Amino acid sequence: MTMADVAGKLIDGFVKAFYIAKKDAKVYYFKAPNFTYGFLMPVSLFLAFSIAGQINSALIVSGLTSLVILFATTSIEAVAVVLEKQTGTFERLLVAPVSFFTILFGKALAGLFFGLVLAIAILVPLAVFSGTTIANPVLVLFAIAFSALAFSALGALVSAYAKWVPEAQMLSNFLRFPMAFLSGTFVPLELMPAQLGIIARLLPLTYSVEALRISINDSAPITTYLLDILVLALFSFALLVIAAKVLQRKIE
């Protein structure tokens, strides 16, 4: 197989994934209730910690933006495949010459676009009201995009494993809430006990918060930011590969 053949297959797969993403965006994501839920839980958590005086104002912009991306993308992604398996529409995708990985990548792309829109919708007013100057908007957009892709891939894994919507919702909450408290969203990693700091480095939300904080505040070298983006990309790929294998095993 030549390089041209490989490139052709990659482009063909991406085109198929794009159309799957376009369909999912219309059917699942861009509806008013989804926007509301994407904001509601993260904002509630931050308000609770802010009232208690346990949150540093410098963490609000990056931490809340990351949480909005996490809750918004996983809330829909975690049930999308489950719903399609129950209604029989997922089998229609399998009739086409498309791999399980491509299907899930397309669904994750829809989550990426939705997370990008929601993150910008919360980031801009947060920056204005807090008086925060965004140091590098381009790096912020890349951080949001890779964060949304990683969290969508996590949701895809949950959706591939679950049989029913309540099971998918329970599993996604089981993953989201520990991440929300252990990833430096409310308390900087430097102030955490060493054991919790090690656990935090195993969670994708940690790298999302750190990448956003660096790109917003210019608080660390660019190499740290690039490492965060690389880790988010690796999380995305690994989670999608695992999700594709889980889904294939459960269906076949």
Where are these regions (language model features)?
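Transmembrane helix-boundary elements of multi-pass transport/secretion proteins
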Residues: V6-K9, G13-K16, I20-T87, G115, ...
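Short amphipathic alpha-helical coupling elements at transmembrane boundaries
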Residues: Y19, K23-V27, E91-V95, K163, ...
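Hydrophobic alpha-helical transmembrane segments of multi-pass membrane transport proteins
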Residues: S44, A58-L126, G155, F174, ...
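Transmembrane alpha-helix boundary and packing residues in multipass membrane permease domains
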Residues: F46-S50, L123, A127, A156, ...
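Alpha-helical transmembrane segments and their short interhelical loops
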Residues: F100-S172, I222-A233, F237-A243
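Short, membrane-exposed interhelical loops at transmembrane-helix boundaries
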Residues: T206-A220
